[in-house]
Amino acid sequence: MSGYARRQGAPPLSRTRSLVVPDAPAFYERRSCLPQLDCERPHGGDLHPHLFGFRPTFMCYVPSPVLASVGDTGFGYGKGKCTNQGPSGAPETRFGGDKLEDLEEANPFSFKEFLKTKNLSLSKEDTTTSRIYPKEASRHPLGLEHSSPASQLMGYGLESQQPFFEDPTRASNLEEDEDDGWNITYLPSAVDQTHSSRDTQDSPPCDTYLSFFSNSSELACPESLPPWTLSDTDSRISPASPAGSPNADFAAHEESLGDRHLRTLQISYEALKDENSKLRRKLNEVQSFSETQTEMVRTLERKLEAKMIKEESDFHDLESVVQQVEQNLELMTKRAVKAENHVLKLKQEINLLQAQLSNLRRENEALRSGQGASLSVVKQNTDVALQNLHLVMNSAHASIKQLVSGADTLNLVAEILKSIDRISEVKDEVDS
């Protein structure tokens, strides 16, 4: 999944080697060598009816290579912490990260609870038969050590287990059925496939599988487990009965016990299957949420890139505007300098004009002072000019008369010239 780093060389989730359902407080301790998964655990609400009223509390220890394949999810790796972002009020399931008092609650998948359930179911049967045979009583604990969940506690991969005591009777078939039932109960489908594929090859020793969980001192042994309490119905085989042919009572008891055990295993299998489906749904939700967040991040990156491009273009526009403003300021500065120079020139011209104006004022005052003395001279000049004009007029009249008389003479000469042309023409006609 994009957006999260995956560890190199991590195998797929289907290669999960073991799922431990602990029944002792030692298995509730945190182990620094093992990664733990903390998921949500129900703190309230109605309990599922198929869990017999018990609250499902179990703990998964998964090898680190297997957990690395789930690195894309939102679960905490290696620290046993996880923050689920589910809706408020939803039921939660926690794996291995609860407090000690929460982990010490009743575990329906533990060996103790299995013993209690089996003792309660066996006590309700017919108590009239009270035959106890030492051979059968000694066989049951030994067979239990082989087929009990304590052996399953070591992990799914413990296929090299050998019983401490093998009875040639048909009870061994019952123990094999119980082993098969436990394998079906605690093995998911993906682990079953890997489990069956490893059967065809050389299986590593049990110590390699036990190293995934803890040292051998921490593993639950038959001495640390509560003893198997046999009821009246647990030993119905007569000592005189042959080893290969148990009586009808034991066959009926075996059948009822197997059916009851099968129902219990089916219920636990369904519970684990539901829990597996819930975890898968949560994983799908986390993956979808991660994809949504990745798409949102990509959208935000695109928006941020577009915004950065827009800001860059705005920055370039602002730079051009600033440059233009600087050019305008320089031009205005030049214009201001020119205006100052022009003002200086105008001031100088004003000073010159003021000087000329003062001179003209002085001349005007002088003329006004000398105007009274020059009036008599002006009158004399005007009289002389009038006399001269009269003389010119008289001479002009005389010349005009002469011109008129000269014009009359010119008209007479023109008439004479015209008559000369006529006289010549008449003479020519007479000659012809």
UniProtKB/Swiss-Prot annotation:
Source organism, top-level taxon: Eukaryota
Q: Which GO terms describe its biological process?
A: cell division; cell projection organization; endocytic recycling; positive regulation of cilium assembly; positive regulation of protein localization to cilium; protein transport; regulation of cytokinesis
| Coiled-coil region | 262-289, 315-370
Q: Which UniProt keywords apply?
A: Cell cycle, Cell division, Cell projection, Cilium biogenesis/degradation, Coiled coil, Cytoplasm, Cytoskeleton, Endosome, Phosphoprotein, Protein transport, Transport
What's a single GO CC term here? centrosome
What residue spans carry the region label Disordered?
A: 126-145, 226-250
SS bond list: none
Purpose of the protein: May be involved in modulation of TNF response. May be involved in presentation of TNFRSF1A on the cell surface. Involved in the endosome-to-plasma membrane trafficking and recycling of SNX27-retromer-dependent cargo proteins, such as GLUT1. Involved in the regulation of cytokinesis; the function may involve PTPN13 and GIT1.
Q: Known PANTHER family for this protein?
A: ENDOSOME-ASSOCIATED TRAFFICKING REGULATOR 1 (PTHR31259), ENDOSOME-ASSOCIATED-TRAFFICKING REGULATOR 1 (PTHR31259:SF3)
**Name of the protein in its database record:** Endosome-associated-trafficking regulator 1
What is the organism lineage in this UniProt record?
A: Eukaryota, Metazoa, Chordata, Craniata, Vertebrata
Question: Gene that codes for this?
Answer: Entr1
